[in-house]
């Protein structure tokens, strides 16, 4: 019994002596998070051109596995307002991670919803975006969303323009 008590006390001391490996910290009320909220609102309003003020000129931007330069990603996001109405970011969460290695990334999670202007179909998909910062500029972005509806509706829109 004495050995069991000593073993339990030893385990308790070892368990309490674990040091935390803090990798950084996360804020949701900082300037970078506010900038991303402003950029998201400009997208929802149908004009993402404001992003040029914050993007580095040589940045790369991924929409799932498709890579775009600054002009390509801005034009692409602006085109959404040609095909959809009532675009929304439901349950939006924006927070910025400041990591010990010096990297800073803003995370933007939401449920994207919209109604097709042409077909009237309603869509709703979860979406996750990462905005990678170099000082006060955004050098890269990555957005993951099911692109099926966007591609289908874009094809219908392109066909209607011919």
Task: Label every model-predicted segment.
Residues 140-162:
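Low-complexity, intrinsically disordered terminal/linker segments enriched in charged
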Residues 109-138, 142-145:
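Exposed beta-sheet edge and beta->alpha loop/turn motif
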Residues 16-49, 53, 161-162:
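Short, low-complexity N-terminal intrinsically disordered segments enriched in polar/charged residues
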Residues 39, 51, 99-117, 127:
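Conserved N-terminal glycine/acidic-rich loop preference
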Residues 47-98, 104:
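A solvent-exposed, acidic/Ser-Thr-rich amphipathic alpha-helical stretch
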Residues 4-13:
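Sec-dependent N-terminal signal peptides
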Residues 39, 50-52, 59, 73, ...:
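Hydrophobic pocket/interface hotspot
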């Amino acid at each position: 019994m004495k050995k069991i008590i000593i073993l339990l006390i030893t385990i308790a001391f070892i368990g309490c002596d674990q040091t935390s490996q803090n990798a950084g910290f996360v804020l949701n009320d900082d300037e970078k998070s506010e900038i991303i909220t402003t950029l998201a609102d400009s997208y929802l309003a149908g004009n993402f051109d404001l992003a040029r003020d914050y993007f580095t000129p040589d940045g790369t931007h991924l929409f799932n596995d498709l890579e775009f330069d600054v002009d390509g990603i801005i034009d692409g996001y602006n085109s959404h307002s040609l095909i959809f109405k009532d675009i929304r970011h439901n349950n939006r969460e924006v927070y910025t991670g400041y990591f010990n290695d010096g990297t800073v990334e803003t995370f933007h999670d939401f449920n994207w919803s919209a109604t097709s202007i042409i077909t009237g179909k309603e869509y709703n998909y979860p979406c996750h975006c990462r905005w990678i910062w170099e000082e006060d500029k955004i050098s890269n972005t990555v957005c993951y969303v099911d692109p099926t509806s966007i591609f289908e509706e874009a094809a219908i829109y392109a066909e209607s323009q011919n």
